[in-house]
Structures are given as structure tokens and as C-alpha cells.
Amino acid sequence: MAGQNKEGAENMKPYKILIIEDDPVIQGEMETLLRGNGYTAVSVKDFSKVTDTFKAEEPHLILLDIKLPNESGFSICSKIRSISNVPIVFVTSCNTDMDELNSIMLGGDAFITKPYNTAILLAKIAALLRRVYASEQSEILTWNDATLHLESSMI
């Protein structure tokens, strides 16, 4: 599956993605898309506790809207970036160059405008996860019943 690590995928949990989106229809669509592609999808329910939800869930990646209740996605990005390097993908109806520039300057890793192309969204998610977590995946190789730990050279 797209969301699982290649080596020993059957023994590893899929990547967890936190959705920070206040539109329930879009939130539901994202959850369905992600789960259908092998990811674990978790959505923020209480927008006054986004940072707490992030800390509790420990996601591998965040999908973040800009226009949210209580505070902007830009503010949330800054708060999360101050405590974590988790990849952040802005998925938003805000489509100006300034919006995209702000997202980059505040630590966002990708910027996708709504309505989004699901194939492009999934490709960006996969690319970010591969880049950020590649070293974790490559430390252990599994073939049939044999497991090689690269760091220690132990089988």
C-alpha cells in the first residue's frame, strides 16, 4: 500500500496523517482518500486544542488549512514548527502568491490549492514521507524470513 513502508510492510503500521480542516465534507473526503491508500487518518475535532491534538497523536505528516476557527493555519504552522519538524502540507482555498510564500516562510513543506487533484495530493504526501522517513525505513531490510539490521550488520 502507498502509505506503508516497503520493507516488512506487513509488520509495520501505516503512516499517521493529521488533518486540520474545519469543513466536515472536505475533512471526510480526505479521511476516506487517505485510509483508502493505506494511511491512518486522524482529524482535529476541537480547534481550540490543535497543538494538544498534535502532541497526543504524534502524526508523521499534517494536512493544514489556512482559514480555521480560533486561529489561522499560519499560526498553527508556526506553533508546530517550533516543537517539531513534521512535514506540513497546506491544503487551502487561499490561492495568492503571498499565501504560498507565507506558508513556505513559516515552515510549510508543500502548498496545494482547493479544489485539489487527489493524485497530486497523494504524490506529494508520499514524496515527503519518503524523504523524511527514508533513513528509518532503510535501517532494516526484510526478505522472506530474514531481517538484516544495516546499522549493526546483524541478521
Predicted regions and their residues:
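N-terminal/domain-start alpha-helical segments
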Residues: 2-132
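Short, Lys/Arg-enriched segments at the junction into DNA-binding effector domains
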Residues: 15-16, 127-155
